Curated annotation (Swiss-Prot):
It comes from Pseudomonas putida (strain W619). The active site is at D66 (proton acceptor). Its cofactor is Zn(2+). The keyword Secreted does not apply. Keywords: Endonuclease, Hydrolase, Metal-binding, Nuclease, tRNA processing, Zinc. This is Ribonuclease Z.
Length: 321
């Protein structure tokens, strides 16, 4: 299971960072999910191995443009690339008409079914490998975090149950191991009932804009990776007296330490933070502030950088993408 950051800047792009977009990639390495789609996201995708034909769903955290203005272009390009499979788009209900109008007014034809789902009524979204739920956050507009949880990872046959039910070893077991339904002694046996996860499911939280990390306290229990905004450092907020509904690196780090988060990834950095350490404010100041309060595995997300979440839940940087 991987994370690939397509945009890590808050509000506006910079020369080094595009606006918000994060790819969550299945363990298989092919299918993937997109959280937020700021302007220029499809351009970022051109620098990755990801294909819009393999995109399973898009999840938008809130209505602000740096998280959604890339949608019309990405959807139109998906159609032009030959995509035909239906696509679920989970986003605030307030954006549904905007998406429809953007496509209609630009005479954009989609050769696939676009299913618009209101994030406010989502409950839980599922594919065959992942479950996605939401956590309400605190921002100037309604905002959510998306919690990705693996379903039945690396399933193995429940041999004890098979033996207990007298199901003979052989071809039947092979079919059940594939998740198929078979008939035995007048009974219909469903593969899903005889498969058990061989390891703990990995869990990842990808947050929208949020000024109160404590709202994640329940969801963050036993989470492997927390991806959270760190738009400002504390001195900037203290000097200006406003946070605009965003978090400081210190606030997120303190929460992650208290919650026992193993891997903390900070993203959504204000454009004022430069990559050049000779200039101030510099992105290194975000890292330094977080390190004071957090002793776990800290990562500052970088555009077009891929990170792998191992079977043991450890997060590591991938060389190349």
């Amino acid at each position: 299971m991987d994370l690939l950051f397509l945009g890590t800047s808050a509000g506006v792009p910079t020369k080094a960072r595009n606006v918000s977009a994060t790819a969550v990639i299945e363990a298989s390495g092919s299918h993937w999910y997109l959280v937020d789609c700021g302007e220029g996201t499809q351009h970022q995708l051109l620098h990755t191995p990801l294909s819009v034909r393999d995109l399973r769903a898009i999840f938008i955290t809130h209505v602000h443009g740096d998280h959604c203005f890339g949608l019309p272009g990405l959807l139109a390009s998906a159609g032009m690339s030959g995509r035909t499979a239906p696509l679920d788009l989970v986003l605030p209900a307030a954006l549904h008409d905007w998406v429809r109008l953007s496509l209609a007014a630009s005479d954009s034809f989609l050769p696939f079914e676009l299913r618009l789902l209101a994030v406010e009524q989502l409950g839980e979204w599922r594919s065959d490998t992942l479950a996605v739920s939401t956590v309400q956050l605190s921002h100037r507009v309604p905002s959510v975090a998306f919690v990705f949880t693996e379903l039945n990872p690396e399933p193995r046959l429940d041999v004890q149950r098979l033996d207990a039910e007298g199901i003979p070893r052989g071809p039947l077991w092979g079919e059940l191991a594939k998740g198929l339904t078979v008939e035995h002694a007048g009974r219909m046996l469903h593969g899903r009932d005889y498969l058990r996860a061989s390891r703990p499911a990995r869990r990842v939280i990808v947050c929208g804009d949020n000024d109160n990390p404590e709202l994640l306290a329940e969801a963050a229990k036993d989470v492997d990776v927390l991806v959270h905004e760190a738009t400002f450092t504390q001195p900037i907020i203290a000097r200006t007296g406003v946070s605009f509904g965003h978090s400081s690196a210190a606030a997120v780090a303190r929460f992650a330490e208290t919650a026992g988060v193993r891997n903390l990834v900070l993203t959504h950095f204000s454009a004022r933070y430069q990559p050049d350490p000779r200039r101030s404010p510099c992105i290194d100041e975000v890292r330094e502030e977080a390190q004071v309060h957090y002793s776990g595995n800290l990562t500052l997300a970088q555009d077009l950088q891929r990170y792998h979440i191992g079977r043991d839940g450890c997060l590591g940087r991938v060389t190349g993408i």
